[in-house]
């Protein structure tokens, strides 16, 4: 088929999470609560780290960046999902779909690289405590965060540059609630076997290997902590377990979605909801509920902002 004779699809239709109006209302209320809590939780982390001088350390500087990413990442999909749950016709233009894919992979890639930077920070703090302040200076942290965003940008450019030349001339129905490579790729009017293999290698294989690398890194860190003594050991172990939990919650759904052939499975929508909406909510909960220093800083900030709390 010659691409010049192909009529390009101008919009895609989502089947969404459910076809039932009652279920749509329940899901809307639930996901709206989750999204608002995600925004407030991550915003609270950003404000606390910014306003509390005791938290002006590399670890919290990186945590604030992760909170920014979580707000942006969830906002890429959640508002559209909420709108569609209240709409009979769930459509998205071709341009908006490609834009959503670009932002989704930019922020998702930056998130993965940022989690790697946080693992590096944790390793430096434990293995080289005397040189930690020098190695993880404010300038170095800024450079690492910038590199994380740039890595996400490059990853996203690769994804979108592979998709844009493809012809979309026939079916335009997506059995999902957001635009992503696996779903959109199945609607093209050409053979995508080689491209699918390339994207599985680029997304799935790299993500799996990166996840294994991070787990090995944290295992080394925990083994290093076993030989140390002192009051900081428990705090370091708590920090590491929080990191491991967040890494697992982020990577496992990614591996499920991208490290297999792009065929629809019954559990795909549930995993996608966890990946796109639930995970950004859990990150602030994990980092704050297990972190006494963060909770103390939030209480101090509350006393400063609410006059009655000072009494």
Curated annotation (Swiss-Prot):
Membrane topology: Multi-pass membrane protein
Keywords: Cell membrane, Disulfide bond, G-protein coupled receptor, Glycoprotein, Membrane, Olfaction, Receptor, Sensory transduction, Transducer, Transmembrane, Transmembrane helix
Record GO terms (molecular function): G protein-coupled receptor activity; olfactory receptor activity
Entry's Gene Ontology cellular component terms: plasma membrane
Residues bearing attached sugar chains per UniProt: 5
Side Cytoplasmic, residues: 50-57, 121-139, 220-235, 290-311
Extracellular side: 1-25, 80-100, 159-195, 259-269
SUPFAM superfamilies named among the record's database cross-references: Family A G protein-coupled receptor-like
Residue ranges crossing the lipid bilayer per the database entry: 26-49, 58-79, 101-120, 140-158, 196-219, 236-258, 270-289
Localization per record: Cell membrane
Gene3D superfamilies: Rhodopsin 7-helix transmembrane proteins
Disulfide bonds listed in the record: 97-189
Biological role: Odorant receptor.
The family this protein is said to belong to: Belongs to the G-protein coupled receptor 1 family.
Protein name: Olfactory receptor 4D11
Species of provenance: Homo sapiens (Human)
């Amino acid at each position: 088929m010659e691409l010049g004779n192909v009529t390009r699809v101008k919009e895609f239709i989502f089947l969404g999470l459910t076809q039932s109006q009652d279920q749509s209302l329940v899901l809307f209320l639930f996901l709206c609560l989750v999204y608002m809590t995600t925004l407030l939780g991550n915003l609270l982390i950003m404000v606390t780290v910014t306003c509390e001088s005791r938290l002006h350390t590399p670890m919290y500087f990186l945590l604030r960046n992760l909170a920014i990413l979580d707000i942006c990442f969830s906002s890429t999909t959640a508002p559209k999902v909420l709108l569609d749950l209240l709409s009979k016709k769930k459509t998205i233009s071709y341009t908006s779909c490609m834009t959503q894919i670009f932002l989704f992979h930019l922020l998702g890639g930056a998130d993965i690289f940022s989690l790697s930077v946080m693992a590096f920070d944790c390793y430096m703090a434990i293995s080289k405590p005397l040189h930690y302040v020098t190695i993880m200076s404010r300038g170095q942290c800024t450079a690492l965060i910038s590199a994380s965003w740039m890595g996400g940008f490059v990853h996203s450019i690769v994804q979108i540059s592979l998709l844009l030349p493809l012809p979309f001339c026939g079916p335009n129905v997506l059995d999902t609630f957001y635009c992503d490579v696996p779903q959109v790729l199945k609607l093209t009017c050409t053979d995508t076997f080689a491209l699918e293999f390339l994207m599985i290698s680029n997304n799935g294989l790299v993500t799996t290997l990166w996840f294994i690398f991070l787990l090995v890194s944290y295992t080394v860190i925990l083994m290093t902590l076993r030989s140390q003594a002192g009051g900081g050991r428990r705090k370091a172990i708590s920090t590491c377990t929080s990191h491991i939990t967040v890494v697992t919650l982020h990577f496992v759904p990614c591996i499920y979605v991208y490290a297999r052939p792009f065929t629809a499975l019954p559990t795909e929508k549930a995993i996608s909801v966890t990946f796109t909406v639930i995970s950004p909510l859990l990150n602030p909960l994990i980092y704050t509920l297990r972190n006494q220093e963060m909770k103390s800083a939030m209480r101090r900030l509350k006393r400063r902002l609410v006059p009655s709390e000072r009494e």
